[in-house]
């Protein structure tokens, strides 16, 4: 009885499930060949005029391929207050994807057929989604306002050693996207710009600069690993093209036979 004056409805939700994904080439389990005239051709009938192309193996099939597997856990709340004028929807989700289907870079040591599909990566996703709605009416005028906000977190959790430092933008040596969000990118970190020739001289006296050309008005790069050398080893993860926060606002109004709606995201 103590909630009747303000709580109109309350629902709790929970779900768990497993989904699969097989979105790769239909022929990924088969060896793939193609014809090539430039690297080799043959004259089988001996007349010296009829030339047939050679056949090269481009990709090796993988009979052990299986679907990606995504386990997802969801918790949710649906609530309404003040005679259903105020609404709240809140969701939390957690997704773990294993056996992601990826094609490794060409493996030259095996000769022909160096491309191959594998179940070889894992990724975690989690987030919170909230929607707040207010709706009311004043005589013939009705209106509703809805605001939604979402927070997402993504992380690559596993890659095979052969592509650990190259797939997804790694530097190929010692920095890997494992532990970073999908869509991450690497770059140099700036420490301002050179304002005078004296600053340029001092910078060149201190560092062995192997990238860029220091000069007045140009970017000064940081020596991240402290070896007094400015090179590709000083690149680091700078961010991701995957947004952490997403929000939107929807406003609707109606008066007699007229209505108006506005959406912003």
Model-predicted regions and their roles:
Residues 2-68, 87, 91-123, 176-178:
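Solvent-exposed loop/turn elements at secondary-structure boundaries
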Residues 8, 69-73, 124-128, 141, ...:
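Residues that define the transmembrane beta-barrel architecture of outer-membrane proteins
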Residues 26-29, 33-35, 137-239:
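Conserved small-residue
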């Amino acid at each position: 009885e103590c909630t009747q004056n303000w709580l109109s409805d309350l629902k709790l939700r929970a779900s768990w499930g497993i989904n699969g994904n097989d979105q790769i080439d239909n022929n990924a389990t088969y060896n793939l060949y193609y014809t090539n005239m430039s690297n080799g051709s043959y004259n089988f009938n001996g007349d010296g005029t009829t030339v047939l192309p050679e056949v090269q193996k481009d990709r090796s099939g993988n009979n052990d391929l299986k679907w990606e597997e995504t386990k997802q856990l969801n918790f949710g709340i649906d609530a309404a207050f003040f005679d259903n004028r105020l609404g709240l929807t809140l969701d939390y989700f957690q997704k773990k994807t294993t056996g992601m289907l990826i094609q490794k870079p060409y493996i030259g040591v095996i000769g022909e057929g160096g491309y191959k599909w594998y179940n070889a990566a894992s990724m975690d996703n989690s987030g919170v989604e909230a929607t707040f709605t207010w709706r009311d009416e004043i005589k013939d005028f009705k209106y509703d306002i809805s605001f939604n906000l979402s927070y997402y977190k993504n992380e690559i959790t596993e890659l095979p050693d052969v592509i650990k430092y190259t797939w997804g933008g790694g530097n190929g040596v010692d920095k890997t996207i494992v532990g970073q969000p999908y869509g991450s990118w690497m770059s140099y970190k700036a420490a301002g710009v050179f304002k005078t020739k004296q600053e340029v001289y001092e910078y060149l006296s201190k560092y062995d600069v192997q990238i860029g050309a220091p000069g007045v008005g140009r970017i000064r790069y940081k020596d991240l690993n402290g070896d007094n050398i400015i090179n590709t080893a000083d690149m680091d993860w700078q961010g991701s093209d995957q947004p952490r926060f997403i929000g939107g606002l929807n406003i609707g109004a109606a008066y007699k036979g007229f209505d108006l709606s506005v959406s912003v995201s």
